[in-house]
């Protein structure tokens, strides 16, 4: 199972083949706080969005994928509102 199919299986997450993953969240200046592409001002490859984990450590999407699909799924399920745009 790929990370995209795992994420797509969650009811509040949508994904595309370009790794643009959006969690439902309030927007800030037109940029979704939990959109990996950060409103087009960045991208997963450039760290356009950062998620803060339960331990306080910050993760980019590639880092979340690197730590494993199971951990990523559990993390994303509880990550609503924790992303921050850094453009």
Curated annotation (Swiss-Prot):
Residues folding into a coiled coil are: none
GO terms for biological process, alphabetical: sorocarp development
Question: To which protein family does this belong?
Answer: Belongs to the hssA/B family.
In its UniProt entry, what is this protein called? HssA/B-like protein 31
Please report the organism this UniProt entry assigns to the protein.
Answer: Dictyostelium discoideum (Social amoeba)
Query: What gene, per UniProt, encodes this protein?
Result: hssl31
């Amino acid at each position: 199972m790929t990370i995209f199919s795992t994420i797509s299986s969650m009811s509040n997450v949508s994904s595309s083949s370009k790794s643009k993953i959006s969690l439902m969240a309030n927007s800030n200046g037109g940029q979704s706080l939990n959109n990996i592409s950060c409103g087009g001002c960045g991208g997963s490859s450039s760290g356009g969005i950062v998620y803060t984990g339960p331990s306080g450590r910050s993760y980019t999407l590639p880092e979340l994928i690197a730590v494993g699909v199971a951990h990523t799924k559990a993390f994303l399920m509880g990550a609503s509102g924790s992303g921050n745009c850094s453009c």
